[in-house]
Amino acid sequence: MEFSVMLNLLIEGTVMTAEIFFVTLVLSLPLGMLVCFGRMSKNIIVRSFFKFYISVMRGTPLMLQLMVFYFGPFYLFGLQITDTWKQLAWILGFSLNYAAYFAEIYRGGIESMPQVQYEAAKILGYSKSQTFMRIILPQVIKRVMPSITNEAITLVKDTSLAFTLSIMELFNQAKALAARETNMIPYAIAALIYYVFCLLVAFVMEQAEKKMSYYR
């Protein structure tokens, strides 16, 4: 196989990897905040539910979760697995998994805020929602940015788990090409692409963190 053809196939895989990454990030970041609110709820039923959800998502392998979402409808209800469901399965699997991790990151940031800030905001006449949105949340985001960056970099590498659903992302393309060509060149190129992707994510997140430094 010509090198240009191999490279084009790996680029196609990279596009799929990027799609998984960005869709997961866009969905799991806000969902994680909602899960965080549920985890910190004063209602014991709500709090227990989200605590259990987080425990399951963090305590079982992401690969297993993807397979449950993908094959679950077939084994439980006898439903036919379609390409549309395959797309929905990885979206649900990745988003729900990472939402649990982001929820705990947010919770740690919120609980680290001094109680005196809430009291000062109350004295100034701020409502609870105003206090959170205008005073607490900006500081929390700044504090948790390093942890979010670490999770984002982990997500870049975790996208390779989509191969379990036969999705032709970067790793799966490299695996197929390496088997066809019986050499390690596709793996080496894929490793380089993953590394550059991680560097770009780290750079973007670092710039975002610097822009928020005025919250200190």
Positions of the model-derived regions?
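Transmembrane alpha-helices and adjacent helix-loop boundaries
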Residues: 1-216
